[in-house]
Amino acid sequence: MATLSDVAKKANVSKMTVSRVINHPETVTDELKKLVHSAMKELNYIPNYAARALVQNRTQVVKLLILEEMDTTEPYYMNLLTGISRELDRNHYALQLVTRNSLNIGQCDGIIATGLRKNDFEGVIKAFEKPLVVFGQNEMGYDFIDVNNEKGTFMATRHVMGLGEREVVFFGIDLDEPFERAREQGYIRAMNKSFKKSNMFRIDNSSKKSECLARELLKSMDNQAAFVCASDRIALGVIRAAQSLGKRIPEDVAVTGNDGVFLDRISSPRLTTVRQPVVEMGEACAKMLLKKMNEDGAAQGSLFFEPELIVRESTL
């Protein structure tokens, strides 16, 4: 069985360097890490991470707290889980999924939280003693990862404006949260840029609700229309409403969504959407948390990912 000394000899480095690569990878260069990991792989050397955790007084467990109700019809959180677990696995950490009622079961070294609303910061989150990273923009000073929601909706609105003269309506989610306000602001900025009057509605994040509202609006519209929606789910309801009235998509009614993780690909016609790189964002959450844990809880700030406008048949 290979030893740490064997790895050091194979990589032509000191035992101290091998130990640093294993126990404190953030303190060594990528070149050194690659060299040592290559030697470990060649010698089939497996570090004792349980012993390391014991010495460092760590559990090697990170909790993912989801405070939002998960919809089994779309894999948004599965994509997030994939990204988080992928990065944690690279660093030999286990991921424990917890809810509001199971949060305090078992120990952990840090927490990633998502689906938070304003009252959660004063209640659940304020009681945390472990390093925390939030998936989703917040205004409470907590480190977070998110997509540039304002830019995404701005791009979608500008896109439908390029389809010709038509009334551009925004269907937002009825939540007074940073991500929703940012999406609304993107629409408003695009409308103002073209000196157009905003026409905004806030509804539940439900395709049934959006279908009912869109049907009533479309009945009263004489001109071509475009609906910029704050979620793919809302956009699907708009498409159904237009089709039920015999409207052509996109000739009569153009529709865009937001999220781009599943529903956009099963709609007919396929939905133009603002894609969030959720897997990559999940990886970034884990990276930020691990760095925070290694820096004794030091603040990490925020990171915004760039959205991507995926143009499909609902606006083509």
Swiss-Prot record:
Record's Gene3D superfamilies?
3.40.50.2300, lambda repressor-like DNA-binding domains
What positions does the DNA-binding region cover? Answer: 4-23
Domain of life, source organism = Bacteria
Biological process (GO) annotations held by this record are:
regulation of DNA-templated transcription
This entry's Gene Ontology molecular function terms read:
DNA-binding transcription factor activity; transcription cis-regulatory region binding
What protein am I looking at?
Uncharacterized HTH-type transcriptional regulator YvdE
Entry-linked InterPro entries: HTH_LacI, LacI/GalR-like_sensor, Lambda_DNA-bd_dom_sf, Peripla_BP_I
Question: Any idea where the HTH lacI-type domain is?
Answer: 1-56
Q: Which UniProt keywords apply?
A: DNA-binding, Repressor, Transcription, Transcription regulation
